[in-house]
Amino acid sequence: MREIVHIQGGQCGNQIGAKFWEVISDEHGIDPTGTYHGDSDLQLERINVYYNEATGGRYVPRAILMDLEPGTMDSVRAGPFGQLFRPDNFVFGQTGAGNNWAKGHYTEGAELIDSVLDVVRKEAEGCDCLQGFQITHSLGGGTGSGMGTLLISKVREEYPDRIMETFSVVPSPKVSDTVVEPYNATLSVHQLVENADECMVIDNEALYDICFRTLKLTTPTYGDLNHLVSAAMSGVTCCLRFPGQLNSDLRKLAVNLIPFPRLHFFMIGFAPLTSRGSQQYRALTVPELTQQMFDAKNMMCAADPRHGRYLTASALFRGRMSTKEVDEQMLNVQNKNSSYFVEWIPNNIKSSICDIPPKGLKMAVTFVGNSTAIQEMFKRVAEQFTAMFRRKAFLHWYTGEGMDEMEFTEAESNMNDLVSEYQQYQDATAEEEGEFEEEEGEN
């Protein structure tokens, strides 16, 4: 079967990861002790995508938890599903990375990385046919960003042909948790561009907005935000885990979404999102789901898709629905909003349908879009980076760990290149390409 090994790093990654395992376990009927209490054979049919079956019919997540300080791990272990994980798969240091990318990537993290890789190997060996890795981490801190990207490059070296998918929480525009976020994020993006296959970009501010506006929560907690992310994460892999009419997997997703290798940063969304009160008053239809799915307010990262154009998009539907209706809706969206899709990639929305909806819903959809508008986010981080780097503020924390200023300059220009690549394809039209070819032919 096509297994996925899940890795979570740093505080943010571990909190999102813990929530994700609650959601997945719920979908597959696994209780906090790893015992199956489900009501349908479908839950067990492909449970080995995310779980290993241990002795006595116990299901153990293929999850690796890493951090440079023990705090978050202890709270995961004490949390509702803490006893689910294999104790050997908790790998942690004692020092912490102190929000310093260099500590995570070069010093503290580098000391711990070998023990993480041992666990990764052990998990990979327990798979029949490993599909790939998914990593949850944030880019603003030290461990998830520094050590997370170090792990990605090491795993990349060892498993070059497996898909590497990340769920990366990027710094928010207005809310900043750490002053040095722009540094950590830029250094991380520099790595992700080269070593990851698909990055789902998430940010807290967009998640807060969804909680306020759509879910009508007055005081959303990180738990609520992480639940949103988990819903989308589970949607991305539901086709691997449940039977469907039109299947998709991580590799198909990558092939359909990435027109150029560097442009693999996606926005994700999830529908239906309704406030708890109004849930039972409406029956969902495919058109309604499609409408909400493409709504800018539904995106889990603070970039407005209306400011750019979609290169490609993928709609992963869940529930019983007609394939014909899904296809019609997808065509409909592209025809009505043609200016928001590049015309040089015809039919650029891929859809897939998985028969089993999430718990408590009749149908749902996860949206993954490759939009040029994501450059807004990179631009924002780059501006903050430049403002500090020009004055060499806070640099001594990084150079003290053995980093060189050159690395910062490289990361900065790599990020600026990425922004201009997105801009170039946003402006490109179908006709121009033809003209270029003719000119070349004449010479």
From Swiss-Prot:
Post-translational modification: Some glutamate residues at the C-terminus are either polyglutamylated or polyglycylated. These 2 modifications occur exclusively on glutamate residues and result in either polyglutamate or polyglycine chains on the gamma-carboxyl group. Both modifications can coexist on the same protein on adjacent residues, and lowering polyglycylation levels increases polyglutamylation, and reciprocally. The precise function of such modifications is still unclear but they regulate the assembly and dynamics of axonemal microtubules.
GO molecular function: GTP binding; GTPase activity; metal ion binding; structural constituent of cytoskeleton
Region listing for Disordered, in residue ranges: 424-443
Upper classification of the organism: Eukaryota, Sar, Alveolata, Ciliophora, Intramacronucleata
Signal sequence, start to end: none
PANTHER family with a match to the protein in the record: TUBULIN
SMART domains: Tubulin, Tubulin_C
Main location: cytoplasm
Cofactor(s) this protein cannot do without: Mg(2+)
Subcellular localization(s) per the UniProt record: Cytoplasm, Cytoskeleton
Gene3D superfamilies named among the record's database cross-references: Helix hairpin bin (1.10.287.600), Tubulin/FtsZ, C-terminal domain (3.30.1330.20), Tubulin/FtsZ, GTPase domain (3.40.50.1440)
Organism: Tetrahymena thermophila
Positions bound to GTP: 11, 69, 138, 142-144, 204, 226
Start-end of Acidic residues biased regions: 429-443
Record protein name field: Tubulin beta chain
Gene: BTU1
Subunit-level organization: Dimer of alpha and beta chains. A typical microtubule is a hollow water-filled tube with an outer diameter of 25 nm and an inner diameter of 15 nM. Alpha-beta heterodimers associate head-to-tail to form protofilaments running lengthwise along the microtubule wall with the beta-tubulin subunit facing the microtubule plus end conferring a structural polarity. Microtubules usually have 13 protofilaments but different protofilament numbers can be found in some organisms and specialized cells.
Residues that, per the record, bind Mg(2+): 69
